[in-house]
Amino acid sequence: MSQSIEDYLERIYLFIKENNRPIKTTELAKLLNIKPSAVTNMAKKLHRLGYVNYEPYIGITLTEKGIEEAKKILDKHKTIKIFLVEFLGLDEKTASEEACKLEHALSDEILERLKIFMEKFKDKV
């Protein structure tokens, strides 16, 4: 999955969770700092891939598949951020920015190993 798709799913999920309604393409464009037409194109692509439901003038919602992927991305972000703060001593803001970069490159296998490492050594930090 591309970094761009992951960013869209993450932003859509967080918006819907916070606002309890579909996100409009103009709102998502503003959040991602891109043109609404680019969001519309990606919404159509995400719909074809089965991640979102997209209805013009109503907005974008996540399918079960989209929710599952978004939660995995957010879990990855959270795990990396905790590691960076608790194990490497980064401040929250820097850790969040770095986690956003790293979450796209980290495989599921490495994420699981990182979780095991953190659990094993959490009392030694």
Swiss-Prot record:
Q: Where does the HTH dtxR-type domain start and stop, copy by copy? A: 1-63
Show the InterPro entries listed in the entry: DtxR_MntR_Metal-Reg, Fe_dep_repressor, Fe_dep_repressor_sf, HTH_DTXR, Iron_dep_repressor, WH-like_DNA-bd_sf, WH_DNA-bd_sf
Top-rank taxon of the source lineage equals Archaea
Which keywords accompany this UniProt record?
DNA-binding, Transcription, Transcription regulation
Q: Does the keyword Transcription regulation apply?
A: yes
Gene Ontology molecular-function annotations: DNA binding; DNA-binding transcription factor activity; protein dimerization activity; transition metal ion binding
**Which Pfam families does the record match to this protein?**
Fe_dep_repr_C, Fe_dep_repress
PANTHER family in UniProt:
IRON (METAL) DEPENDENT REPRESSOR, DTXR FAMILY, IRON-DEPENDENT TRANSCRIPTIONAL REGULATOR
Protein family: Belongs to the DtxR/MntR family.
What is the name of the protein in this document? Uncharacterized HTH-type transcriptional regulator MJ0568
Question: What is the species listed in this Swiss-Prot or TrEMBL entry?
Answer: Methanocaldococcus jannaschii (strain ATCC 43067 / DSM 2661 / JAL-1 / JCM 10045 / NBRC 100440) (Methanococcus jannaschii)
Print the organism lineage.
Archaea, Methanobacteriati, Methanobacteriota, Methanomada group, Methanococci
